[in-house]
C-alpha cells in the first residue's frame, strides 16, 4: 500500500543553555494513505514533538537536526525538513495538505475574532474563493461536525462556547480544506467523558466520509482500540513497537506495551484489587546514556539491556519491536 508520509532517522533536539535535549531520537515511520495510525505513550515520550515536526511547528529552541519527513503527493515527494517553517511553500502545505487538531481548544483559537472569521480566513488563505462562498462553506462544515445553528452562531466568540463546541470548531477548521493528512493531538484530553465519546464518534464519521490519513495521538489505549488501524508505541523519543491494532492488543511484545495494556482499568476486575502500574517514571530525554531507555522500569531487564540499544526489527509482516527478548 502506498504511503503518504515516510519518516527516516528523525532527530529533534532542544538546545538549552548548558545541554542538548534529544526529544526525538532516530524515528523511522511510514504512514499509509487513508489509514489511521495511533501513537501511544506516557507524557514526555515525544508524541506531540513528532506531530509538530511533521507540521513544521517545533517551537524554539527545538529543531530537526537529522533525518527526513517525506510527504508524497501526485507522484512528487517533498522533504518537509528542508522547507523553512515560515516560507510560503510551508504555509501552502500547512492547513491545506496537512492539518492539526490541538489538545487545548480553549487556547488554540484567537479570542479577538469570532469563530466564523477564523474558519473563513483558513479557506481564503488556501482557496481562490470570495467571502460569500467561504462563509457558506464555513456553515456547511460546522453542520457536518455537529455544531448547532451555525448560520447564527458563526458570529460567536471562543469564550462564548463550551469546550466540546470549541473542539468541534477546531475539527471543522482542520477539515475545511479537505487535507490529505489530519493530525489529532489528544483531541479528547481536555473534555469530559460524555463529550469525549461524541468527539470520537465524530472522528470515526470523518474517517468514513473524508477518508484522510490520520495520526491520532493519545495516552488512552481504549481510544486507540476504536480509532486506529495501526499503533506505534513511543517511549522517550523512540518507537519501541509498531503493529496492527489487532496485534497490539492480542499479541503485544515489548514489555512497555504489555505494561500499558495491563494498566488499563477493566469493568470485570476484582473489587479492592489495586490497579496494575508500571513502576518508576519516564526518564528525561537523554538521561539514560547507554542501553535501552526502558531498562530501569522493565520487569524482564537483562544485563545486555543496560549496555546496548536494541534495534526496531520486524517480527512479522504486521509487527516490529525494539527489544532484546526478540533480537
Predicted features by range, described:
Residues 15-18, 57-61, 74-79, 114-133, ...:
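ABC-type ATPase nucleotide-binding domains, specifically the catalytic core motifs of the NBD
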Residues 76-99, 125, 247-252, 284-289:
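ABC ATPase NBD coupling module
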Residues 78, 244-327:
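Charged, flexible cofactor/metal-binding loops and thiol motifs
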Residues 156-161, 165:
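Conserved ABC ATPase signature
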Residues 176-180:
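A short, proline-enriched helix->beta-strand linker immediately N-terminal to the Walker B motif
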Residues 183-187, 191-273:
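P-loop NTP-binding/switch modules centered on Walker-like glycine-rich loops
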Amino acid at each position: 500500500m502506498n504511503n503518504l508520509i515516510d519518516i527516516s532517522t528523525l532527530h529533534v533536539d532542544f538546545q538549552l543553555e548548558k545541554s542538548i535535549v534529544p526529544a526525538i531520537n532516530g524515528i523511522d515511520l511510514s504512514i499509509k494513505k487513508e489509514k489511521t495510525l495511533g501513537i501511544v505513550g506516557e507524557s514526555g515520550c515525544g508524541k506531540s514533538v513528532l506531530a509538530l515536526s511533521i507540521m513544521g511547528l517545533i517551537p524554539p529552541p527545538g529543531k530537526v537536526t537529522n533525518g527526513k519527513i517525506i510527504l508524497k503527493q501526485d507522484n512528487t515527494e517533498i522533504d518537509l525538513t528542508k522547507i523553512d517553517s515560515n516560507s510560503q511553500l510551508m504555509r501552502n502545505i500547512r492547513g491545506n495538505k496537512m492539518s492539526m487538531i490541538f489538545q487545548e481548544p480553549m487556547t488554540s483559537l484567537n479570542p479577538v475574532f469570532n469563530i466564523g472569521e477564523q474558519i473563513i480566513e483558513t479557506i481564503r488563505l488556501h482557496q481562490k474563493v470570495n467571502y460569500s462562498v467561504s462563509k457558506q462553506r464555513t456553515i456547511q462544515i460546522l453542520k457536518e461536525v455537529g455544531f448547532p445553528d451555525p448560520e447564527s452562531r458563526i458570529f460567536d466568540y471562543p469564550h462564548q462556547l463550551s469546550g466540546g463546541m470549541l473542539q468541534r470548531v477546531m475539527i471543522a477548521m482542520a477539515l475545511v480544506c479537505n487535507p490529505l493528512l489530519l493530525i489529532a493531538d489528544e483531541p479528547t484530553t481536555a473534555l469530559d467523558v460524555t463529550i469525549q465519546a461524541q468527539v470520537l464518534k465524530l472522528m470515526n464519521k470523518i474517517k468514513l466520509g473524508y477518508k484522510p490519513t490520520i495520526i491520532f495521538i493519545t495516552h488512552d489505549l481504549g481510544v486507540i482500540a476504536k480509532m486506529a488501524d495501526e499503533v506505534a508505541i513511543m517511549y522517550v523519543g523512540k518507537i519501541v513497537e509498531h503493529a496492527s491494532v489487532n496485534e497490539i492488543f492480542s499479541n503485544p511484545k515489548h514489555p512497555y506495551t504489555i505494561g500499558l495494556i495491563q494498566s488499563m482499568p477493566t469493568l470485570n476486575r476484582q473489587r479492592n484489587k489495586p490497579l496494575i502500574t508500571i513502576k518508576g517514571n519516564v526518564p528525561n530525554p537523554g538521561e539514560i546514556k547507554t542501553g535501552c531507555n526502558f531498562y530501569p522500569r522493565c520487569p524482564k531487564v537483562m544485563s545486555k539491556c543496560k549496555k546496548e540499544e536494541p534495534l526496531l526489527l520486524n517480527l512479522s509482516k504486521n509487527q516490529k519491536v525494539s527489544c532484546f527478548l526478540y533480537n
